[in-house]
Amino acid sequence: MHELSLCEGILQILEEQSRTQGFIQVHRVCLEIGALASVEPEALRFHFDVVTQGTLAEGSHLEIVTVPAQAWCLPCGEKVSVGQYFDACPQCGSRQLQVIAGEELRIQQLEVE
């Protein structure tokens, strides 16, 4: 259920940006969520609708873009796609991978008034 606290944090960012940028309403929020971020998109959508009620983001559309997980294989030097932590490198079989994408959760774009 950490999606609720994530949505509260997103709303806090929107409110801070509203004060500094001068917008009064949010129409669309586009989030990038990494495949390894342990975030359930449907739960996030549900909590976003609940948390934004009565705020500048009420009724806004939440768009979620999933960022595929990628890692750097230390032994063979290849950039590879991974499905989960501790996957083996599909090129050489090593498990010495450093994740370079797929853990993020960030606001990519806002549509505001």
From Swiss-Prot:
Alphabetical list of Gene3D superfamilies matching this protein: 3.30.2320.80
Residues reported to bind Zn(2+): 73, 76, 89, 92
Keyword Cytoplasm: no
Annotated InterPro entries: HypA/HybF
Gene Ontology terms: biological process: protein maturation; protein modification process
Positions that bind Ni(2+): 2
Top-level taxon: Bacteria
Pfam family, one: HypA
GO MF annotation, one: nickel cation binding
Coiled-coil region: none
Keyword Metal-binding part of the UniProt annotation: yes
Alphabetically ordered keywords of this record: Metal-binding, Nickel, Zinc
Known role: Involved in the maturation of [NiFe] hydrogenases. Required for nickel insertion into the metal center of the hydrogenase.
Family designation: Belongs to the HypA/HybF family.
Protein name, UniProt field: Hydrogenase maturation factor HypA
Organism per entry: Acidithiobacillus ferrooxidans (strain ATCC 23270 / DSM 14882 / CIP 104768 / NCIMB 8455) (Ferrobacillus ferrooxidans (strain ATCC 23270))
